[in-house]
Amino acid sequence: MYKRQVTPPATGISEEENLAGDGDIHKVYLTFEDGPSDHTGEILDILAQYDVKATFFVVGKEDEESQALYQRIADEGHTLGMHSYSNKYSQIYQSDEAFEEDFERLRDELYQVTGVNSIYYRFPGGSSNQISNVPMSDFIHYLNEQGVIYYDWNVSAGDAASNAYSSEEIVANVMDDVVKYKTSVVLLHDASDKSATVEALAPLIEALNEMGAEILPIDEDTSVIQYVKADSID
C-alpha cells in the first residue's frame, strides 16, 4: 500500500529571486510529460548516452510496455512524477472528487508497479490553468495535505503548442530562456506525436553542457517553480 508522506507546503521561488547574475551556475531540469509512449524509450536511451537524469511526469497506462517504462524510469535514476491518470481535463477538473480519484489511481498504480512513492506532480495545463470547473486552490490544498509538491515550468520548448517546430527550433526555444535563470524547469513532451522533441534532445544536452549548465532531476533540493504558490493556499 502507498505510504502517505506529509510535508509542509513547498515555498516557490519568485522569478526575481531566480534571475541569473554573472557567475551563477545554471541548474536545468528537463521534464517530460504525457508519456510513456513509443518515444519514451528513445529518450531514455539518449539520456543514458549522455549520463543525464531527467524528470518524467507520467500519465496512467496499464499495458505491459508502459509499465515497463515506469520501471525503467525509476531504475535508471530519473524522477518519476505524476501528471494525472487520464490526462483529460474535462474529467480531472470536473470536481474535487474527480481530481482526487484520478490522482489516487495514478499514485497507487505507480507504487504497485515500481515501489516508488511519488511525491511530485504536474497539473495538466499548469497550476494557473483557466480550464478547471473548480478553483485550482482546492486541488492545491489537497496536494498540500498529501505532502505532494507540484511543479510548473519557467522554460518551454514550445512542443506543447505545436508539432510544427523543428528540432533546431525546439533547442533554440529552450536555450533562449535558460540563460535567464538560476533554476530552469523545462517543459518537454514525450507523447507519441513528439518526434521533433526526441530529435532535439541530444543537441539540447550538448548545448547545455557547452554553456556549463548542471542538468539534474527534480529532487528535494530543487527550487520549486510554481505559478500559484503552494504556501499561499490555506
What are these regions (language model features)?
Residues M1-Q5:
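Conserved small/polar residues in nucleotide/adenosyl-binding loops
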Residues V6-N117, A207, S223:
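Active-site beta->alpha N-cap acidic-glycine motif
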Residues N87-L187, A191-N209, A213-E214, E220-D221, ...:
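Catalytic domains of cell-wall/extracellular-matrix polysaccharide-remodeling enzymes
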